[in-house]
Design a protein with these regions (language model features):
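Conserved donor-binding/catalytic core segment of Leloir-type glycosyltransferases
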Residues: 8-9, 140, 177-195, 201-204, ...
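Short His-centered aromatic/hydrophobic patch
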Residues: 87-93, 106
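Conserved acidic donor-binding segment of nucleotide-sugar-dependent glycosyltransferases
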Residues: 295-305, 312-318
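Nucleotide-activated donor-binding/catalytic signature segment of Leloir-type glycosyltransferases, i.e.
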Residues: 225-242
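Membrane-proximal helix-turn-helix segments that form the acceptor-binding/catalytic region
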Residues: 121-139, 152
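A charged, aromatic-enriched C-terminal amphipathic alpha-helix characteristic of glycosyltransferases
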Residues: 316-348
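Short alpha-helical donor nucleotide-sugar binding micro-motif in glycosyltransferases
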Residues: 241-242, 249-254
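Short hydrophobic beta-strand element within catalytic cores of glycosyltransferases
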Residues: 271, 280-283
Length: 349
């Protein structure tokens, strides 16, 4: 009788609480695995626990001083009588792993991100990033940009773009929450410094015919809510975290999607989510965004006048694009799953 085949993912967060970002990518990757392969997801959490996430067995290792010791102990036990493939998204977990990482997915280079904020430990991050690549058999990048900005200098890599689980989520039909007379602008972002939310607040201030709704949470949400309140703006709302069904409803009903960033956009998932719903997406001309956007006319400089003019010009021209076809041809679940299927077939031989 042959050994069990197991794929073990390393991530960051509890996927039942944090449902976007890296967790989405791991879910998409896992769907390409054959049915006979067992799936595990490991992360550092608030306590030691086990639970199921779809068909993936999740292992939370308590975030304490002994977490890396417990990680290696668990893996040694799990892989003792099985063929294990370790697919990591977490630099630190791979760095302290005694085994080699089979596949390492790069969302943003560790040194690149720390350099953008001039982090005081950026040289330590540089060392960690290089060490992880040396310990990885194959490196997967989610865009050409992430490859170019990484410290990886070998040839054993692959580029596979992201897709979105929203494709399989049913739209939740609810009462309309928009002012039907205004141009409806929607965005899904983590509320942090790099996403340039100030630009949307400026846009709301400049043009009262725009109604802007932002889905997402983050460390600066109360700061920006206070700013909106102090400026007495009633045409922009930070809605906080929304379930996927509601997000699909807002995408479906909006006129425009924006994806703004100062840096650190290794792919730009909300761009393809906008295209899934056949919406025009205006996004910052930074990072990986230019290689994902349908046409450069939708790229904006991080300037409120440029952003406003681009939107108004598009609405006047009413030029026709098949955004949905662009999504399904380049980023659809089936297209991306097929690429991961070929990757895992090669790795699991």
């Amino acid at each position: 009788m042959g050994k069990d085949k197991i794929v073990i993912y390393f991530g960051f967060n509890n996927p039942l609480i944090y449902k976007r970002g890296v967790e989405n990518v791991i879910l998409s990757q896992s769907m390409a695995l054959p049915e006979n392969v067992k799936k595990y997801y490991l992360f550092f959490g608030e306590k030691d626990e086990e639970f199921l996430w779809n068909d993936i067995k999740c292992i939370s290792i308590m975030h304490d001083l002994f977490r890396f010791f417990k990680l290696n102990t668990f893996l040694n036990k799990l892989c003792r009588n099985a063929e294990c493939v370790i697919h990591s998204h977490n630099y630190l977990m791979s760095f302290f792993l005694l085994k080699k990482t089979d596949i390492f997915t790069v969302h943003d280079g560790l040194f690149y991100l720390s350099s953008q904020t001039n982090h005081r430990f950026k040289n330590i991050f540089k060392f960690i990033e290089k060490a992880v690549y040396k310990k990885s058999k194959l490196v997967h990048f989610i865009s050409k940009f992430t490859k170019e900005e990484s410290l990886y200098n070998k040839d054993n890599f692959i580029i596979i773009y992201n897709t979105t689980p929203l494709e399989k989520v049913k739209v939740k039909f609810e009462k309309e929450n928009w002012d039907s007379k205004k141009v409806k602008i929607f965005t899904v972002r983590s509320i942090e410094e790099r996403v340039n939310l100030e630009l949307l607040i400026e846009l709301a201030q400049r043009n009262k015919d725009f109604e802007i709704k932002v889905s997402g949470k983050g460390p600066l949400i109360e700061k920006y809510r206070d700013e909106i309140k102090n400026k007495k703006l009633d045409n922009i709302e930070l809605m906080g975290f929304l379930e996927d069904e509601k997000i699909r409803k807002y995408y479906k009903d909006c006129d425009i999607v924006t994806v703004l960033a100062k840096y650190g956009e290794g792919f730009g998932l909300p761009i393809i989510e906008g295209y899934l719903h056949d919406k025009p997406v205006f996004a910052s001309n930074v990072s990986a965004i230019p290689e994902v956007i349908i046409n450069k006319e939708f790229l904006v400089e991080n300037d409120v006048i440029n952003l406003e003019n681009k939107i108004l010009n598009y609405l006047k021209k009413n030029k026709s694009y098949n955004f949905k076809e662009y999504y399904y041809s380049n980023f659809g679940n089936d297209v991306i799953r097929d690429k991961y299927f070929k990757l895992y077939n090669h790795t699991l031989k």
